Curated annotation (Swiss-Prot):
Protein name per UniProt: General transcription factor 3C polypeptide 5
Region (Disordered): 465-519
The UniProt record lists the keyword Chaperone: no
Cell membrane recorded as keyword: no
GO terms assigned for molecular function: DNA binding; RNA polymerase III general transcription initiation factor activity
Acidic residues composition bias: residue spans: 484-500, 507-519
N-acetylalanine sites (modified residues): A2
UniProt-listed InterPro entries: TF_IIIC_su-5_HTH, TF_IIIC_Tfc1/Sfc1, Tfc1/Sfc1_N, TFIIIC_tauA_Sfc1
GO biological process, one term: transcription by RNA polymerase III
Protein backbone atom coordinates (compact mmCIF):
# COMPACT_ATOMS: atom_id res chain seq x y z
CA UNK A 1 0.00 0.00 0.00
CA UNK A 2 2.88 2.36 0.76
CA UNK A 3 4.52 1.67 -2.63
CA UNK A 4 1.29 2.39 -4.46
CA UNK A 5 0.91 5.66 -2.58
CA UNK A 6 4.44 6.70 -3.62
CA UNK A 7 3.86 5.94 -7.31
CA UNK A 8 0.58 7.85 -7.55
CA UNK A 9 0.38 11.59 -7.79
CA UNK A 10 -1.25 14.10 -5.48
CA UNK A 11 -5.00 13.62 -5.13
CA UNK A 12 -5.00 10.13 -6.61
CA UNK A 13 -7.12 7.34 -5.11
CA UNK A 14 -5.47 4.56 -3.16
CA UNK A 15 -7.12 1.16 -2.69
CA UNK A 16 -7.34 0.06 0.93
CA UNK A 17 -8.53 -3.10 2.61
CA UNK A 18 -11.76 -2.62 4.58
CA UNK A 19 -12.12 -4.79 7.67
CA UNK A 20 -15.88 -4.92 8.07
CA UNK A 21 -15.79 -7.30 10.99
CA UNK A 22 -14.20 -4.71 13.31
CA UNK A 23 -16.97 -2.47 14.68
CA UNK A 24 -15.81 0.33 16.94
CA UNK A 25 -17.28 3.01 19.19
CA UNK A 26 -15.84 6.53 19.19
CA UNK A 27 -15.79 8.90 22.15
CA UNK A 28 -14.88 12.51 21.40
CA UNK A 29 -13.02 13.11 24.64
CA UNK A 30 -13.05 16.80 25.64
CA UNK A 31 -9.38 16.93 26.54
CA UNK A 32 -5.86 15.98 25.55
CA UNK A 33 -5.28 12.32 26.39
CA UNK A 34 -1.71 11.66 27.47
CA UNK A 35 -2.35 8.57 29.60
CA UNK A 36 -5.14 6.18 28.62
CA UNK A 37 -4.90 4.43 32.00
CA UNK A 38 -5.90 7.69 33.71
CA UNK A 39 -8.47 8.65 31.08
CA UNK A 40 -10.60 5.49 31.27
CA UNK A 41 -11.58 5.88 34.96
CA UNK A 42 -13.07 9.29 34.16
CA UNK A 43 -15.57 7.49 31.90
CA UNK A 44 -16.31 4.74 34.39
CA UNK A 45 -13.71 2.30 33.14
CA UNK A 46 -14.18 -0.29 30.44
CA UNK A 47 -17.03 -1.86 32.39
CA UNK A 48 -18.85 1.46 32.73
CA UNK A 49 -18.45 2.34 29.06
CA UNK A 50 -19.67 -1.12 28.05
CA UNK A 51 -22.70 -0.79 30.30
CA UNK A 52 -23.63 2.59 28.83
CA UNK A 53 -23.10 1.34 25.29
CA UNK A 54 -25.40 -1.63 25.92
CA UNK A 55 -28.30 0.76 26.66
CA UNK A 56 -28.95 3.12 23.73
CA UNK A 57 -31.00 5.46 25.95
CA UNK A 58 -28.12 6.23 28.32
CA UNK A 59 -25.71 9.12 28.05
CA UNK A 60 -21.99 8.68 28.67
CA UNK A 61 -20.86 10.51 31.81
CA UNK A 62 -17.38 12.01 32.23
CA UNK A 63 -16.13 12.70 35.75
CA UNK A 64 -13.13 15.03 35.87
CA UNK A 65 -12.30 13.74 39.36
CA UNK A 66 -13.44 10.09 39.47
CA UNK A 67 -12.62 9.61 43.15
CA UNK A 68 -14.45 12.76 44.26
CA UNK A 69 -18.09 12.05 45.20
CA UNK A 70 -18.86 15.76 44.82
CA UNK A 71 -17.77 15.82 41.19
CA UNK A 72 -20.61 16.63 38.80
CA UNK A 73 -20.24 14.94 35.41
CA UNK A 74 -20.59 16.22 31.88
CA UNK A 75 -22.67 14.06 29.59
CA UNK A 76 -22.17 12.95 26.01
CA UNK A 77 -24.99 12.28 23.58
CA UNK A 78 -25.03 9.14 21.49
CA UNK A 79 -25.22 9.36 17.70
CA UNK A 80 -25.14 6.88 14.86
CA UNK A 81 -22.45 7.40 12.26
CA UNK A 82 -20.69 5.74 9.34
CA UNK A 83 -17.03 6.57 9.81
CA UNK A 84 -13.69 4.85 9.43
CA UNK A 85 -10.84 4.74 11.91
CA UNK A 86 -7.76 5.31 9.76
CA UNK A 87 -4.15 4.90 10.87
CA UNK A 88 -1.55 6.77 8.79
CA UNK A 89 2.19 6.32 9.27
CA UNK A 90 4.69 8.65 7.66
CA UNK A 91 8.06 7.03 6.95
CA UNK A 92 11.09 9.09 5.93
CA UNK A 93 14.22 7.48 4.49
CA UNK A 94 17.34 9.53 3.98
CA UNK A 95 20.02 8.60 1.44
CA UNK A 96 23.21 7.42 3.02
CA UNK A 97 26.51 8.97 2.01
CA UNK A 98 24.97 12.09 0.48
CA UNK A 99 25.45 15.38 2.29
CA UNK A 100 24.29 18.92 1.79
CA UNK A 101 21.58 20.11 -0.54
CA UNK A 102 21.95 17.09 -2.79
CA UNK A 103 20.50 14.81 -0.09
CA UNK A 104 16.93 13.78 -0.83
CA UNK A 105 14.68 12.00 1.62
CA UNK A 106 12.17 9.42 0.48
CA UNK A 107 8.76 9.88 2.15
CA UNK A 108 6.14 7.13 2.15
CA UNK A 109 2.78 6.83 3.84
CA UNK A 110 1.28 3.66 5.28
CA UNK A 111 -2.50 3.71 5.58
CA UNK A 112 -4.53 1.10 7.42
CA UNK A 113 -8.24 1.00 8.25
CA UNK A 114 -8.56 -0.30 11.78
CA UNK A 115 -12.34 -0.62 11.77
CA UNK A 116 -15.75 0.90 11.14
CA UNK A 117 -17.24 3.36 13.64
CA UNK A 118 -21.01 2.98 13.89
CA UNK A 119 -21.59 4.82 17.18
CA UNK A 120 -20.08 8.05 18.43
CA UNK A 121 -20.44 9.92 21.72
CA UNK A 122 -20.16 13.72 21.56
CA UNK A 123 -19.91 16.06 24.54
CA UNK A 124 -22.10 18.92 23.38
CA UNK A 125 -23.49 20.19 26.68
CA UNK A 126 -22.20 22.77 29.09
CA UNK A 127 -20.24 21.80 32.16
CA UNK A 128 -21.83 22.62 35.50
CA UNK A 129 -20.07 24.28 38.43
CA UNK A 130 -17.68 22.04 40.34
CA UNK A 131 -17.67 22.13 44.13
CA UNK A 132 -14.45 21.21 45.93
CA UNK A 133 -14.25 20.22 49.58
CA UNK A 134 -11.63 22.88 50.20
CA UNK A 135 -11.45 25.43 53.01
CA UNK A 136 -9.86 28.83 52.46
CA UNK A 137 -8.03 30.08 55.53
CA UNK A 138 -7.53 33.69 56.55
CA UNK A 139 -4.15 33.97 54.85
CA UNK A 140 -5.53 32.72 51.53
CA UNK A 141 -4.19 29.20 51.96
CA UNK A 142 -6.42 26.39 50.70
CA UNK A 143 -6.79 23.27 52.82
CA UNK A 144 -8.37 20.04 51.66
CA UNK A 145 -11.27 18.72 53.76
CA UNK A 146 -11.77 15.36 52.07
CA UNK A 147 -10.10 13.38 54.86
CA UNK A 148 -12.48 15.00 57.35
CA UNK A 149 -15.66 14.87 55.27
CA UNK A 150 -15.51 11.46 53.61
CA UNK A 151 -15.96 8.27 55.59
CA UNK A 152 -13.73 5.61 54.09
CA UNK A 153 -14.04 3.20 57.02
CA UNK A 154 -16.14 2.80 60.17
CA UNK A 155 -15.30 5.71 62.45
CA UNK A 156 -15.59 6.21 66.19
CA UNK A 157 -17.82 8.77 67.85
CA UNK A 158 -15.03 11.35 68.01
CA UNK A 159 -15.05 11.58 64.21
CA UNK A 160 -18.54 13.09 64.30
CA UNK A 161 -17.73 15.62 67.01
CA UNK A 162 -14.65 17.17 65.42
CA UNK A 163 -14.66 20.85 64.57
CA UNK A 164 -15.01 21.45 60.84
CA UNK A 165 -15.48 24.53 58.69
CA UNK A 166 -18.91 24.83 57.13
CA UNK A 167 -19.09 22.99 53.82
CA UNK A 168 -22.52 22.68 52.23
CA UNK A 169 -22.66 21.37 48.65
CA UNK A 170 -25.71 22.29 46.58
CA UNK A 171 -28.73 20.03 47.20
CA UNK A 172 -29.13 19.48 43.47
CA UNK A 173 -27.11 20.25 40.37
CA UNK A 174 -28.50 21.57 37.13
CA UNK A 175 -30.82 19.09 35.42
CA UNK A 176 -30.15 20.51 31.97
CA UNK A 177 -26.83 20.91 30.19
CA UNK A 178 -28.12 22.62 27.05
CA UNK A 179 -29.13 26.30 26.86
CA UNK A 180 -32.85 26.92 26.56
CA UNK A 181 -34.48 30.14 25.41
CA UNK A 182 -37.00 31.41 27.93
CA UNK A 183 -39.47 33.91 26.58
CA UNK A 184 -40.43 36.23 29.39
CA UNK A 185 -43.83 37.85 29.13
CA UNK A 186 -44.55 41.30 30.52
CA UNK A 187 -46.61 41.46 33.66
CA UNK A 188 -50.29 42.07 33.00
CA UNK A 189 -51.27 45.68 33.60
CA UNK A 190 -54.81 46.42 34.81
CA UNK A 191 -56.67 49.67 34.86
CA UNK A 192 -56.87 51.69 38.04
CA UNK A 193 -59.49 50.34 40.42
CA UNK A 194 -59.29 46.72 39.19
CA UNK A 195 -59.58 44.04 41.88
CA UNK A 196 -58.69 40.40 41.44
CA UNK A 197 -61.75 38.12 41.49
CA UNK A 198 -62.15 35.79 44.47
CA UNK A 199 -60.46 32.43 44.13
CA UNK A 200 -63.03 29.78 43.29
CA UNK A 201 -63.48 26.88 40.92
CA UNK A 202 -65.53 29.00 38.54
CA UNK A 203 -62.75 31.37 37.52
CA UNK A 204 -59.79 28.99 37.63
CA UNK A 205 -58.54 27.27 34.51
CA UNK A 206 -57.01 23.83 34.44
CA UNK A 207 -57.89 22.48 37.88
CA UNK A 208 -57.39 19.01 36.43
CA UNK A 209 -56.76 17.46 33.08
CA UNK A 210 -59.61 16.66 30.74
CA UNK A 211 -61.37 13.42 31.55
CA UNK A 212 -60.47 10.65 29.19
CA UNK A 213 -63.48 9.42 27.22
CA UNK A 214 -63.27 5.74 28.15
CA UNK A 215 -66.35 5.90 30.39
CA UNK A 216 -65.48 3.10 32.80
CA UNK A 217 -67.75 2.43 35.79
CA UNK A 218 -65.98 2.19 39.16
CA UNK A 219 -67.62 0.33 42.05
CA UNK A 220 -66.63 0.32 45.72
CA UNK A 221 -67.08 -2.71 47.96
CA UNK A 222 -69.65 -0.90 50.11
CA UNK A 223 -71.87 0.07 47.16
CA UNK A 224 -75.24 -1.66 47.35
CA UNK A 225 -75.80 -2.43 43.67
CA UNK A 226 -73.60 -3.24 40.71
CA UNK A 227 -74.18 -1.94 37.16
CA UNK A 228 -76.03 -4.24 34.80
CA UNK A 229 -75.03 -2.54 31.55
CA UNK A 230 -72.35 -0.11 30.35
CA UNK A 231 -72.76 3.60 29.98
CA UNK A 232 -74.18 4.73 26.69
CA UNK A 233 -71.06 6.80 26.11
CA UNK A 234 -68.90 3.67 26.50
CA UNK A 235 -71.02 1.82 23.94
CA UNK A 236 -70.83 4.71 21.49
CA UNK A 237 -67.06 4.99 21.92
CA UNK A 238 -66.54 1.31 21.15
CA UNK A 239 -68.86 1.40 18.14
CA UNK A 240 -66.90 4.35 16.79
CA UNK A 241 -63.56 2.56 17.26
CA UNK A 242 -64.73 -0.90 16.17
CA UNK A 243 -64.46 -0.46 12.41
CA UNK A 244 -62.98 -3.73 11.14
CA UNK A 245 -63.52 -7.49 11.48
CA UNK A 246 -60.46 -7.84 13.73
CA UNK A 247 -62.06 -5.65 16.39
CA UNK A 248 -65.37 -7.50 16.21
CA UNK A 249 -63.54 -10.80 16.63
CA UNK A 250 -61.72 -9.44 19.68
CA UNK A 251 -65.04 -8.36 21.19
CA UNK A 252 -66.45 -11.86 20.70
CA UNK A 253 -63.38 -13.45 22.28
CA UNK A 254 -63.58 -11.14 25.30
CA UNK A 255 -67.27 -11.90 25.79
CA UNK A 256 -66.47 -15.62 25.71
CA UNK A 257 -63.81 -15.10 28.38
CA UNK A 258 -66.29 -13.36 30.67
CA UNK A 259 -68.84 -16.11 30.02
CA UNK A 260 -66.30 -18.71 31.14
CA UNK A 261 -65.07 -16.63 34.06
CA UNK A 262 -66.95 -13.53 35.27
CA UNK A 263 -63.93 -11.75 36.79
CA UNK A 264 -60.61 -11.02 35.08
CA UNK A 265 -57.56 -8.88 35.62
CA UNK A 266 -56.31 -6.82 32.72
CA UNK A 267 -53.05 -8.78 32.57
CA UNK A 268 -55.00 -12.03 32.40
CA UNK A 269 -57.02 -10.66 29.50
CA UNK A 270 -53.85 -9.61 27.71
CA UNK A 271 -52.44 -13.10 28.14
CA UNK A 272 -55.50 -14.71 26.54
CA UNK A 273 -56.37 -12.25 23.78
CA UNK A 274 -54.16 -10.42 21.30
CA UNK A 275 -55.53 -6.88 21.24
CA UNK A 276 -53.92 -3.47 20.91
CA UNK A 277 -53.63 -1.85 24.39
CA UNK A 278 -55.44 1.29 23.25
CA UNK A 279 -58.30 -0.81 21.91
CA UNK A 280 -58.50 -2.76 25.16
CA UNK A 281 -58.90 0.46 27.15
CA UNK A 282 -62.04 1.21 25.18
CA UNK A 283 -63.37 -2.35 25.04
CA UNK A 284 -63.18 -3.29 28.73
CA UNK A 285 -65.63 -0.57 29.95
CA UNK A 286 -68.06 -1.85 27.31
CA UNK A 287 -67.97 -5.41 28.71
CA UNK A 288 -67.35 -5.06 32.47
CA UNK A 289 -67.14 -2.72 35.43
CA UNK A 290 -64.11 -2.06 37.64
CA UNK A 291 -63.94 -2.81 41.38
CA UNK A 292 -61.86 -0.33 43.38
CA UNK A 293 -61.92 -1.71 46.93
CA UNK A 294 -62.44 -5.05 48.61
CA UNK A 295 -61.16 -8.54 47.77
CA UNK A 296 -61.85 -8.01 44.04
CA UNK A 297 -60.12 -4.67 43.78
CA UNK A 298 -58.24 -3.91 40.55
CA UNK A 299 -60.32 -6.52 38.68
CA UNK A 300 -62.86 -6.26 35.86
CA UNK A 301 -66.23 -7.87 36.61
CA UNK A 302 -68.94 -8.82 34.12
CA UNK A 303 -71.96 -6.52 34.13
CA UNK A 304 -74.75 -7.81 36.37
CA UNK A 305 -72.50 -10.17 38.35
CA UNK A 306 -72.11 -9.34 42.05
CA UNK A 307 -69.30 -11.37 43.67
CA UNK A 308 -70.36 -10.21 47.15
CA UNK A 309 -73.55 -12.27 46.85
CA UNK A 310 -72.01 -15.39 45.31
CA UNK A 311 -69.64 -17.56 47.41
CA UNK A 312 -68.36 -19.16 44.20
CA UNK A 313 -66.59 -15.86 43.50
CA UNK A 314 -64.08 -16.71 46.23
CA UNK A 315 -61.66 -18.20 43.72
CA UNK A 316 -61.57 -14.92 41.77
CA UNK A 317 -60.37 -12.77 44.69
CA UNK A 318 -57.14 -10.84 44.24
CA UNK A 319 -53.90 -11.47 46.12
CA UNK A 320 -51.38 -8.62 46.33
CA UNK A 321 -48.07 -10.48 46.57
CA UNK A 322 -44.67 -8.83 46.89
CA UNK A 323 -41.30 -10.50 47.01
CA UNK A 324 -39.52 -9.41 50.14
CA UNK A 325 -35.77 -9.12 49.94
CA UNK A 326 -33.08 -8.23 52.43
CA UNK A 327 -29.96 -9.62 54.00
CA UNK A 328 -31.97 -11.43 56.68
CA UNK A 329 -33.69 -13.34 53.88
CA UNK A 330 -30.37 -14.40 52.35
CA UNK A 331 -30.26 -12.13 49.30
CA UNK A 332 -30.11 -8.42 48.57
CA UNK A 333 -32.32 -6.63 46.00
CA UNK A 334 -29.44 -6.58 43.53
CA UNK A 335 -29.04 -10.36 43.86
CA UNK A 336 -32.70 -11.09 43.24
CA UNK A 337 -33.14 -12.58 39.75
CA UNK A 338 -36.48 -10.77 39.38
CA UNK A 339 -36.54 -7.33 37.82
CA UNK A 340 -38.50 -4.39 39.14
CA UNK A 341 -41.34 -2.94 37.12
CA UNK A 342 -39.73 0.45 37.38
CA UNK A 343 -36.95 1.97 39.40
CA UNK A 344 -36.00 5.45 40.51
CA UNK A 345 -32.54 4.75 39.07
CA UNK A 346 -33.97 4.34 35.56
CA UNK A 347 -36.08 7.47 35.37
CA UNK A 348 -35.44 9.49 32.22
CA UNK A 349 -33.86 12.60 33.68
CA UNK A 350 -32.41 15.00 31.11
CA UNK A 351 -29.01 15.01 32.81
CA UNK A 352 -28.44 11.28 32.43
CA UNK A 353 -30.67 9.97 29.68
CA UNK A 354 -31.25 11.00 26.13
CA UNK A 355 -34.78 9.91 25.37
CA UNK A 356 -35.32 8.10 22.09
CA UNK A 357 -38.11 9.24 19.84
CA UNK A 358 -41.22 7.15 20.36
CA UNK A 359 -42.96 5.50 17.47
CA UNK A 360 -46.25 7.08 16.54
CA UNK A 361 -49.47 5.13 16.25
CA UNK A 362 -51.64 6.48 13.46
CA UNK A 363 -55.42 6.32 13.35
CA UNK A 364 -55.09 4.04 10.35
CA UNK A 365 -53.08 1.58 12.45
CA UNK A 366 -55.70 1.58 15.19
CA UNK A 367 -58.54 1.11 12.74
CA UNK A 368 -56.76 -1.86 11.22
CA UNK A 369 -55.93 -3.30 14.63
CA UNK A 370 -52.22 -2.68 14.07
CA UNK A 371 -49.53 -1.08 16.16
CA UNK A 372 -46.54 1.12 15.37
CA UNK A 373 -44.47 -1.65 13.82
CA UNK A 374 -45.07 -0.94 10.16
CA UNK A 375 -46.47 -3.33 7.61
CA UNK A 376 -48.14 -6.56 8.57
CA UNK A 377 -45.65 -8.67 6.66
CA UNK A 378 -42.78 -7.78 9.01
CA UNK A 379 -44.77 -8.20 12.22
CA UNK A 380 -45.69 -11.10 14.39
CA UNK A 381 -48.95 -12.88 13.60
CA UNK A 382 -52.01 -10.97 14.80
CA UNK A 383 -52.96 -13.91 17.00
CA UNK A 384 -49.94 -13.39 19.29
CA UNK A 385 -48.51 -9.94 18.66
CA UNK A 386 -49.91 -8.26 21.77
CA UNK A 387 -50.25 -11.35 23.94
CA UNK A 388 -48.44 -11.50 27.25
CA UNK A 389 -46.92 -14.59 28.80
CA UNK A 390 -48.98 -16.66 31.22
CA UNK A 391 -46.52 -15.86 34.01
CA UNK A 392 -47.94 -12.32 34.31
CA UNK A 393 -51.05 -13.71 36.02
CA UNK A 394 -50.38 -17.39 36.88
CA UNK A 395 -48.21 -18.54 39.79
CA UNK A 396 -46.47 -21.90 39.45
CA UNK A 397 -44.18 -23.68 41.86
CA UNK A 398 -40.55 -23.65 40.75
CA UNK A 399 -40.96 -20.53 38.58
CA UNK A 400 -40.13 -16.99 39.68
CA UNK A 401 -42.66 -14.19 39.13
CA UNK A 402 -41.72 -11.76 36.36
CA UNK A 403 -41.89 -8.78 38.76
CA UNK A 404 -41.39 -8.15 42.46
CA UNK A 405 -45.01 -7.15 42.96
CA UNK A 406 -47.76 -9.26 41.44
CA UNK A 407 -51.57 -9.24 41.55
CA UNK A 408 -52.80 -12.82 41.36
CA UNK A 409 -56.34 -14.16 41.40
CA UNK A 410 -56.73 -17.12 43.73
CA UNK A 411 -57.82 -19.42 40.92
CA UNK A 412 -54.53 -18.67 39.12
CA UNK A 413 -52.35 -20.01 41.94
CA UNK A 414 -51.52 -23.31 40.27
CA UNK A 415 -50.13 -25.04 43.34
CA UNK A 416 -52.08 -27.77 45.16
CA UNK A 417 -50.86 -26.64 48.57
CA UNK A 418 -52.15 -23.11 47.96
CA UNK A 419 -55.51 -24.34 46.69
CA UNK A 420 -55.99 -26.36 49.88
CA UNK A 421 -55.60 -23.17 51.91
CA UNK A 422 -58.15 -21.39 49.71
CA UNK A 423 -60.81 -24.13 49.80
CA UNK A 424 -60.64 -24.91 53.53
CA UNK A 425 -64.08 -23.43 54.16
CA UNK A 426 -65.89 -24.59 51.02
CA UNK A 427 -69.60 -24.79 51.73
CA UNK A 428 -69.23 -22.90 55.00
CA UNK A 429 -68.88 -19.36 53.67
CA UNK A 430 -71.08 -17.32 56.00
CA UNK A 431 -70.26 -13.73 55.11
CA UNK A 432 -68.17 -11.68 52.69
CA UNK A 433 -65.81 -9.19 54.31
CA UNK A 434 -63.88 -6.39 52.69
CA UNK A 435 -60.52 -7.76 53.83
CA UNK A 436 -60.85 -11.52 53.34
CA UNK A 437 -63.90 -11.84 51.09
CA UNK A 438 -65.40 -15.33 51.30
CA UNK A 439 -62.17 -16.86 52.66
CA UNK A 440 -61.25 -17.53 56.25
CA UNK A 441 -59.52 -14.67 58.11
CA UNK A 442 -55.79 -14.36 57.44
CA UNK A 443 -56.02 -16.59 54.37
CA UNK A 444 -54.11 -14.04 52.27
CA UNK A 445 -51.34 -13.90 54.86
CA UNK A 446 -50.95 -17.68 54.85
CA UNK A 447 -50.84 -17.72 51.06
CA UNK A 448 -48.12 -15.07 50.98
CA UNK A 449 -46.11 -16.93 53.59
CA UNK A 450 -46.28 -20.19 51.64
CA UNK A 451 -45.51 -18.52 48.31
CA UNK A 452 -42.53 -16.70 49.83
CA UNK A 453 -41.07 -19.99 51.03
CA UNK A 454 -41.52 -21.48 47.57
CA UNK A 455 -39.75 -18.53 45.97
CA UNK A 456 -36.92 -18.76 48.49
CA UNK A 457 -36.43 -22.41 47.61
CA UNK A 458 -36.50 -21.57 43.90
CA UNK A 459 -33.87 -18.86 44.33
CA UNK A 460 -31.78 -21.25 46.41
CA UNK A 461 -31.84 -23.82 43.59
CA UNK A 462 -30.97 -21.22 40.95
CA UNK A 463 -28.30 -19.38 42.95
CA UNK A 464 -27.08 -21.55 45.83
CA UNK A 465 -24.08 -19.28 46.42
CA UNK A 466 -26.37 -16.58 47.82
CA UNK A 467 -27.34 -18.77 50.75
CA UNK A 468 -23.97 -20.30 51.54
CA UNK A 469 -22.86 -17.40 53.73
CA UNK A 470 -26.24 -16.57 55.22
CA UNK A 471 -27.04 -20.12 56.34
CA UNK A 472 -24.76 -19.90 59.37
CA UNK A 473 -26.00 -16.47 60.41
CA UNK A 474 -29.63 -17.47 60.05
CA UNK A 475 -29.12 -20.60 62.13
CA UNK A 476 -31.36 -22.65 59.95
CA UNK A 477 -34.16 -20.11 59.91
CA UNK A 478 -36.08 -20.74 56.72
CA UNK A 479 -39.23 -18.71 57.14
CA UNK A 480 -39.55 -15.68 54.87
CA UNK A 481 -41.74 -12.92 56.17
CA UNK A 482 -44.48 -11.65 53.98
CA UNK A 483 -46.17 -8.39 53.23
CA UNK A 484 -49.93 -8.30 53.47
CA UNK A 485 -50.51 -5.30 51.25
CA UNK A 486 -53.55 -4.33 53.36
CA UNK A 487 -54.23 -1.18 55.33
CA UNK A 488 -55.02 -3.00 58.58
CA UNK A 489 -51.53 -4.06 59.65
CA UNK A 490 -50.14 -4.13 63.14
CA UNK A 491 -47.19 -2.01 64.18
CA UNK A 492 -44.71 -4.85 63.85
CA UNK A 493 -45.57 -5.46 60.19
CA UNK A 494 -45.31 -1.75 59.45
CA UNK A 495 -41.82 -1.65 60.97
CA UNK A 496 -40.74 -4.59 58.83
CA UNK A 497 -42.08 -2.90 55.72
CA UNK A 498 -40.11 0.24 56.44
CA UNK A 499 -36.98 -1.82 56.92
CA UNK A 500 -37.18 -4.17 53.96
CA UNK A 501 -39.50 -2.86 51.28
CA UNK A 502 -38.04 0.05 49.37
CA UNK A 503 -40.14 2.03 46.87
CA UNK A 504 -37.10 2.15 44.60
CA UNK A 505 -37.33 -1.61 44.20
CA UNK A 506 -39.93 -0.78 41.60
CA UNK A 507 -43.17 -2.13 43.02
CA UNK A 508 -45.98 -0.41 41.21
CA UNK A 509 -49.59 -0.04 42.27
CA UNK A 510 -51.28 -1.43 39.19
CA UNK A 511 -54.73 -0.49 40.45
CA UNK A 512 -53.87 3.21 40.64
CA UNK A 513 -52.16 3.04 37.26
CA UNK A 514 -55.19 1.40 35.70
CA UNK A 515 -57.61 3.89 37.24
CA UNK A 516 -55.54 6.77 35.85
CA UNK A 517 -56.12 5.36 32.37
CA UNK A 518 -59.81 6.15 32.74
CA UNK A 519 -59.79 9.36 34.80
Amino acid sequence: MAAEAADLGLGAAVPVELRRERRMVCVEYPGVVRDVAKMLPTLGGEEGVSRIYADPTKRLELYFRPKDPYCHPVCANRFSTSSLLLRIRKRTRRQKGVLGTEAHSEVTFDMEILGIISTIYKFQGMSDFQYLAVHTEAGGKHTSMYDKVLMLRPEKEAFFHQELPLYIPPPIFSRLDAPVDYFYRPETQHREGYNNPPISGENLIGLSRARRPHNAIFVNFEDEEVPKQPLEAAAQTWRRVCTNPVDRKVEEELRKLFDIRPIWSRNAVKANISVHPDKLKVLLPFIAYYMITGPWRSLWIRFGYDPRKNPDAKIYQVLDFRIRCGMKHGYAPSDLPVKAKRSTYNYSLPITVKKTSSQLVTMHDLKQGLGPSGTSGARKPASSKYKLKDSVYIFREGALPPYRQMFYQLCDLNVEELQKIIHRNDGAENSCTERDGWCLPKTSDELRDTMSLMIRQTIRSKRPALFSSSAKADGGKEQLTYESGEDEEDEEEEEEEEEDFKPSDGSENEMETEILDYV
